[in-house]
Design a protein with these regions (language model features):
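Acidic, glycine-rich active-site loops and adjacent beta-strand->loop/helix elements
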Residues: 76-78, 139-147, 169-172, 211, ...
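Active-site-adjacent substrate-binding region
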Residues: 232-248, 393, 401-444
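A short beta-alpha structural unit
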Residues: 16-20, 264, 298-309, 348, ...
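Zn-dependent metallopeptidase/amidohydrolase metal-coordination segment
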Residues: 7-11, 342-355, 363, 418-478
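Active-site metal-coordination/substrate-binding segment of hydrolases
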Residues: 64-146, 151-162, 202, 313-316, ...
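Midchain, well-structured core segments that form catalytic/ion-binding scaffolds
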Residues: 102-105, 145, 152-365
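Acidic/His- and Gly-rich active-site-bordering loop/insert found
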Residues: 2-103
Length: 486
């Protein structure tokens, strides 16, 4: 199979086009310009707002003008992650895609099908006048991945739809009718620099090979967190030897499970062989723990040039204890929807910043607002007890399921008619923009669906090609069956 043969042709054509347009979160200027130019080229009413959101309207097919207006919605930004051995500048370089069996993936980077496939689907609908539909508005939002900025900034009256179809879900055959709310927290330690004693052995300890993945949608899989695993080894080493912590770094994004982490430490020269033995023992234990969930986990130890400075011992101890105690993973399962994670937390990243600051970023999610606040307070308490300062982002609301939704009934009937099986009705343990849309447009009737994606937010991200055709056929059938306005 070659890329030119992929079906539906229009969707894959536009997906390949937007893969040529850099679109990191908070740096979406190029894709915004691309969308506005697209709307103007096709002589469609196009507008933007101050946040960067773009709305393109397409009139109804003749004879369908009295149907309810449908908003098709996707976010334009993508998570920018790459493997360490890959040279790629997400601000300038296109995403290079390749076919692997029935899957489309990128070469060593995130693919950006989250949510580029939704954007491409909307463009294919806007460009094709043979498709039957009532009035359609295509909403493209910015910065979903790092702050839901576009959804937060959306003003009342910017769009006028009665129904919203969010195209940002990742399992074909599933219709989502609810999502978790979330909040981000930042803990900061201030440290003093101290001298590393002369003659100490300096080395880099690294954790790599983990799958990573989405901190909401994949949190129930029991995947390894590089920050937690590295900290386990550092904690035992700190207790056993006269260890100086010179550098620590792990994870990148608040909404991704940390795949890689490393630390540079210094210990007495006489202990270096024992340290290597310790790491071999620890690595064997950890690899056994994650043999099923994360079988490619690796630990490495490499000699480093001597470091003159390190983090003071008191701060190092408090940091390592806090990272050990900080919760990560599933905290509670839903009592209403079997198999749905209700509340979770992600120990996302550990970074050294200018001004002798160590910053730890975490994110908490829950479909229950009070539980979201509870888990966030738990995280705050752990870090404050260790002497860190803690701050929170604004957070965002969840989307409470409405099992009696009219558009849900239409979509479910359509799926059964087309494919002979029932679609699965679900809620998702991840933040969708839908909860914020309801704040501004409380009468919106919404569902979320999409083709099958795996490994999103990691370089392993891939899209199951046959599900794109099913998603497309389903979407077009839904548009045909939108009811008349009341």
């Amino acid at each position: 199979m070659e890329k030119k043969d992929l079906k539906p042709a229009g969707v894959f054509h536009y997906f390949e086009e937007i893969c040529q347009v850099p679109r990191p979160s908070k740096k979406e200027e190029k894709i915004i310009a691309f969308l506005k130019a697209f709307g103007e080229k096709h002589k469609l009413e196009t507008k933007g707002d101050e946040a960067g959101n773009v709305l393109i309207k397409k009139p109804a097919t003749p004879g369908m003008e009295n149907r309810k207006t449908v908003v098709l919605q996707s976010h334009v930004d993508m998570v920018c992650e790459k493997n360490n051995d890959v040279k790629h500048d997400f601000l300038t370089d296109p995403i290079e895609t390749e076919i692997d069996g029935e899957w489309l993936k990128a070469k060593g980077t995130t693919l950006g099908a989250d949510n580029g496939i939704g954007v491409a689907t909307e463009l294919a609908i806007l460009a094709d006048d043979s498709i039957e539909h009532g009035p359609v508005e295509c909403l493209f939002t910015v910065d979903e991945e790092t702050g839901l900025t576009g959804a937060f900034a959306l003003q009342e009256g910017f769009m006028s739809g009665d129904i919203l179809l969010n195209l940002d879900s990742e399992d074909e055959g599933e219709l989502f009718i609810g999502c978790a709310g979330g909040i981000d927290s930042v803990a900061e330690f201030t440290y003093k620099e101290v001298d590393v004693p002369a003659g100490y052995f300096c080395c880099k300890v690294q954790v790599k090979g983990l799958k990573g993945g989405h901190s909401g949608g994949d949190i129930h899989l029991g995947l390894g967190n590089a920050n937690k695993l590295l900290n386990r080894f550092l904690s035992q080493t700190f207790k056993k030897y006269d260890m100086y912590l010179c550098e620590i770094d792990g994870g990148n994004l608040r909404n991704a499970i940390a795949r890689e982490a490393h630390a540079v430490i210094a210990i007495p020269e006489a202990d270096k062989h024992a340290l290597r033995t310790d790491l071999n023992v620890f690595a064997a234990q950890a690899e056994a723990e994650y043999a099923v969930a994360d079988p490619d986990l690796q630990f490495t130890l490499e000699s480093e040039n001597p470091r003159a400075k390190a983090i003071d011992k008191d701060t190092s101890k408090r940091l390592l204890q806090a990272l050990y105690a900080a919760p990560h993973g599933v905290y509670a399962m839903s009592q209403d929807i079997p198999g749905l994670v209700e509340t979770s937390t992600n120990l996302a990243s550990v970074k050294m910043k200018p001004g002798n600051i160590i910053r730890i970023e975490t994110s908490q999610r829950s479909s229950i607002e009070s539980s979201k606040q509870d888990i966030a307070t738990m995280v705050r308490t752990v870090f404050e007890m260790a002497g860190a300062s803690v701050s929170f982002g604004d957070g965002y609301p969840g989307w409470k399921p409405n099992p009696h939704s009219e558009i849900l009934e239409i979509a479910a009937e359509s799926y059964k008619r087309l494919f002979g099986v029932d679609a699965k009705i679900k809620a998702i343990h991840a933040g969708l923009e839908c909860g914020l849309f309801l704040d501004k447009y409380p009468s919106l009737d919404m569902i979320s669906f999409g083709p099958t994606l795996q490994g999103v937010h990691s370089p392993d991200e891939r899209m199951l090609i046959p599900t794109v055709q099913k998603f497309w056929d389903h979407l077009l059938d839904i548009l045909k069956h939108i009811p008349a306005k009341n």
